[in-house]
Regions:
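N-terminal Sec signal peptide and the immediately downstream disordered periplasmic leader
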Residues: 2-92, 99-103, 264-265, 333, ...
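C-terminal beta-signal and adjacent terminal beta-strands/loops
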Residues: 7, 565, 685-693, 713-775
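Acidic, small-polar-rich N-terminal luminal/periplasmic segments of exported/outer-membrane proteins
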Residues: 58-193, 544
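Outer-membrane beta-barrel translocator/receptor signature
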Residues: 118, 135-137, 149, 158-161, ...
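Periplasmic-side early beta-strands and strand-to-turn transitions of outer-membrane beta-barrels
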Residues: 184, 191-193, 201, 213-322, ...
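Structural signature of Gram-negative outer-membrane beta-barrels, strongest in the C-terminal barrel
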Residues: 259-263, 392-395, 399, 407-409, ...
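Membrane-embedded beta-barrel scaffold of Gram-negative outer-membrane proteins
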Residues: 334-340, 345-363, 498, 504-514, ...
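Gram-negative outer-membrane beta-barrel transporters
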Residues: 402-403, 453, 563-565, 587-691, ...
Length: 775
């Protein structure tokens, strides 16, 4: 597939864009109004975030977010919202999407052997499933445009202005992919004057990269911003079979915007993006029974199948005779129009996105020359997404304000898959389609001074369909297809009381919804087809909180308590076949409760020192999961009973849900005389223990903490900056993902312990140098 095909917009999008542009150009004849405030804002009173270099400075005034689809002071929003600025990303050593969990404690990002299998969770809730068409519980948006695949986000974060993390169900305003929350990545807007930014970086372990951004006016009515980034890292795992490093990545991203203001009340923004990258895969064994044989085959010992590899918790070596890797390419565009109509703002967002990923995996993870050591897995993921949203916003300055909207989405997925030939053979092709239409509304009413009540609702209809062809099945049992439709509603009720301009209390009750889907993975058969789709996931959330600022708004203290119940949570379990092979199955968990406390705080001490702190206490447990799959090697004494074997996880802690997690950061810029200022940055992250598979001791990660630091010098006006940094200062080893692969190893007495790890970027301490120039 060529680059032009990837970024070309569907013809219907082009026709819609042309019609939208013509309609907006005609708007001045229909209404005389002030110029709209910009994307996501209501006219004429919402303030736009700064786009120049000074945007990185901690502002003494308001932090503006678009969590409720209009620009608001974060301290006035009755939701659990946290904002991460570009400066915080740099100070914390965060350059990739998967690093976000280090500075947003309620957020956990779990990597995998390739980006599609990685997943995101908020407050212990996420969708951990490999099947196509399975929606995430945490939506990811870029400039308010949704991504069909979360994998689309697992790359560099260039030209980011801020990242908004909305915790808890957000289905009322954002739809069915936000039943646990959402992440909105906001990129920079065109500036009124020319501005250029260049950044380069290199590390002691051979990572290098850079990015640039150019922005400015083309004419008084037309502005632009264009950015690009490139990064390359060999990895931190060595494949002894060919002496090459793996677990690395290479990525190129580019993004551009044109903002046209044909009239004082009209703003049209055309955006486009393209990405191209690859990853190399290496999952070292950190535990293995010394008597284990590959697929229980005589003679296939560790010394034969993994020569030179010393298995242990510090292992960074593998021996694979097949090059496990992924290659991906994606592109898309959006057209946004904002029209001021007196006290109203009409917003339209049209988007199209296309993404393709090819994955290649050494399925046995060895270099054995026997037939059993040459099992490979090859597949592709294709996605196409078209969306259209229209909303009407009233003025934020009035005591009664509202947001009305309609949304349409059409998404298509394809997945060809091949595995074999020695064991666990598979050869199938699946497609999944979804079409949804929704209407939503939210009303805010200040019934008496300082007391605001909010009510919102959403009604949506979705039709899902699939095809599945199993090329290895017996004639007559090869092809399946089906469809289902569902209409559902969600709502949100809240009240907030502003005691003073700097102190607010709120209470919120909201519901979430994630649509039904089909389990299109290896093993799909007539029984699964007859069972129909996996049930929709529903959630009910209660929150109370306080938003406070002190000392002339130099100290911010935001506290939230939440209690959320999930019914029919869509989750992935392990299915162990008669030969010991494990497949993954999608199922419904009867119930899950997640409750806890979140704290976000910042302090500006003088003009040189800025402190940040975030903490999350989480108690996430299954309230009903009596028939869960047993994990590999689980015994009767460990709770695996019955026929077929199963375990009761009711009352157990949810996976990937640490009880405690916090992040503390400091950014100090003392004057060094003249035009120079020093740079001293530190970030400390802590996470308590987690299971990656429920109650499986082989996937248990103990508590750990990581410290990142940086020292440098910069111009007082931030025209340039040089920072030397060290990540994982104390060289702490941890695993963001563990996989129990006992099904592939054993002897004539049964399967044996075998555990593999996905190593994080900072598995070992490393240093680097970062240079930035702004003018």
């Amino acid at each position: 597939m060529g680059e032009g095909e990837m970024i070309g917009l569907h013809a219907s999008v082009g026709r819609g864009a042309l019609a939208l542009a013509l309609a907006f150009c005609a708007a001045p004849a229909l209404a005389q109004a002030d110029k709209p405030a910009g994307p996501g804002q209501s006219a004429p009173d919402a303030a736009a975030p700064q786009n120049g270099s000074e945007a990185n400075e901690p502002a003494p005034g308001d932090i503006i977010v678009t969590a409720q689809k209009r620009s608001e002071n974060i301290q006035k929003v009755p939701l659990a919202v946290s904002v991460v600025s570009e400066a915080q990303l740099k100070a914390s050593g965060v350059t990739q999407f998967q690093d976000l969990g280090k500075i947003a404690p309620s957020l956990t990002v779990r990597p995998a052997e390739h980006p599609v299998n990685a997943n995101v969770s908020l407050r212990g809730v996420g969708t951990f499933a490999f099947g196509i068409g399975v929606e995430p519980s945490v939506a990811v948006l870029v400039d308010e445009v949704p991504l069909a695949f979360q994998a689309r986000a697992f790359t560099d974060l260039p030209d980011v202005e801020r990242i908004e993390v909305l915790r808890g169900p957000q289905s009322t305003l954002y739809g069915k992919s936000a039943s646990a929350g959402l992440i909105n990545i906001i990129t920079r807007q065109p500036t009124d004057t020319f501005h250029a930014r260049f950044n380069v970086m290199g590390t002691t372990d051979s990572e290098y990269g850079g990015n640039f951004s150019l922005s400015g006016p083309i004419s008084p009515q037309l502005g632009y911003v264009v950015s690009a980034s490139y990064s390359n890292w060999d990895g931190n795992v060595r494949n002894l079979f060919n002496d090459k490093k793996v677990n690395g990545r290479e990525a190129f991203n580019t993004r551009g915007k044109l903002r046209w203001e044909p009239a004082s009340n009209v703003t049209i923004t055309l955006s486009g993006n393209y990405l191209n990258g690859s990853t190399t895969v290496g999952r070292p064994f950190i535990r293995m029974d010394p008597t284990a044989l590959l697929r229980k085959m005589p003679g296939q010992t560790q010394a034969v199948t993994m020569p030179g590899v010393t298995i242990g918790p510090d292992n960074q070596n593998i021996s694979n005779n097949y090059n496990s890797r992924t290659k991906y390419e994606g592109g898309g565009g959006s057209l946004r129009g904002d029209v001021g109509l007196g006290d109203l703002t009409l917003v339209s967002i049209t988007s199209y996105d296309k993404f393709r990923l090819n994955d290649y995996l050494d399925h046995d993870d060895t270099s054995s020359s026997a037939a059993v050591g040459n099992n490979i897995q090859v597949g592709q993921f294709h996605s196409q997404l078209f969306t259209q949203e229209v909303r009407l916003l009233s003025s934020s300055a009035k005591p009664f304000r509202y947001t009305l909207g309609a949304y349409y989405a059409n998404v298509k997925f394809e997945r060809p898959f091949l595995r074999g030939p020695a064991f666990s053979p598979a050869n199938w092709y699946a497609t999944s389609k979804s079409e949804q239409i929704a209407g939503f509304a939210q009303i805010d009413w200040e019934i008496v001074p300082h007391l605001i009540l909010t009510g919102g609702g959403r009604v949506q209809n979705e039709k899902v369909s699939y095809t599945f062809r199993d090329n290895l099945a017996a004639p007559g049992s090869q092809f399946f297809s089906g469809s289902a439709s569902d209409t559902a509603g969600t709502y949100r009720l809240s009240g907030r009381y502003e005691v003073t301009p700097d102190l607010m209390f709120f209470a919120t009750y909201s519901t979430g919804y994630k649509g039904q889907t089909y389990d299109l993975t290896t093993g799909f058969n007539a029984n699964r087809a007859a069972a129909g789709p996996i049930k929709p996931e529903r959630s009910r959330d209660k929150e109370i909180g306080m938003r406070a600022q002190f000392l002339d708004r130099r100290v911010t203290f935001n506290l939230t308590y939440f209690d959320t119940n999930y019914k029919n949570l869509q989750a992935q379990t392990i299915e162990t076949l008669a030969d010991g092979t494990t497949n993954f199955r999608l199922t419904n968990v009867g119930g899950l409760n997640t409750k806890g406390v979140e704290l976000d705080t910042t302090a500006r001490i003088g003009s040189d020192l800025n402190l940040t702190g975030s903490l999350a206490y989480l108690d996430a447990r299954y309230t009903s999961f009596p028939v869960a799959q047993c994990y590999p090697l689980q015994t009767v004494a460990q709770g695996c009973t019955g026929s077929p074997a199963r375990q009761n996880l009711t009352g157990a802690r949810a996976i990937q849900a640490p009880k405690w997690k916090f992040s503390v950061g400091a950014d100090y810029s003392p004057s060094l005389g003249g035009n120079l200022k020093g740079v001293a940055q530190a970030n400390w992250q802590y996470q308590s223990s987690v299971y990656y598979v429920a109650e499986d001791p082989q996937t248990f990660q103990k508590a750990y903490s990581i410290v990142n630091v940086g020292l440098g010098v910069r111009d007082k006006d931030r025209k340039w900056e040089i920072v030397a940094f060290v990540n994982n200062l104390f060289d702490v080893q941890y695993y963001p993902s563990l996989v129990n692969t006992a099904g592939n190893f054993g002897d004539n007495t049964g399967n044996k312990i075998a555990t593999q790890a996905v190593l994080p970027r900072d598995f070992r301490r490393y240093g680097g140098l970062r240079l930035g120039v702004n003018f």
